[in-house]
Amino acid sequence: DVCSSDLGKMSSNTRFALNTWYAVALVNDGSTLTLYINGEKDNSMTVAPYEYALYGVQIGMPSKGYQSSQLFYGRLSEMRLWTRPLSAREIKANVCGVDPSTNGLVSYWRMNEGEGTTFYDLSPSKRDISYKNGITIDWTYDDTNKCLE
């Protein structure tokens, strides 16, 4: 499952292959949550209206109603949060990166520091993510340009 709400759960329709890079985007326009895989619409669900607020983001962690066997076992290359819903065209155009000063970009973590326990936010808001309490990051290096594949 990609996410769940009081209105139900949403899963991807994509059969993910091992050792394959995917660009995953979730867009919430206030009434519909849409999942994009590699810039193409994959699935969507109705969601309740919301007020913009960042209460917390869980990636790869079991949440209410999920089993520990559903943990995310993979690698992340970057993560972005926006204050506005992006169009499919914008998602596709920004798969390989985005200008940190782009209108509506709240946070942009490239996750390419290579050492330490902090992901630095390149956006003007500077919401760095630091891991504490013995949590470590397993840094890996991959010089393959996924955007050219």
Q: What are the functions of these language-model segments?
A:
Residues 5-91, 96-125, 136-149:
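Extracellular glycan-associated modules
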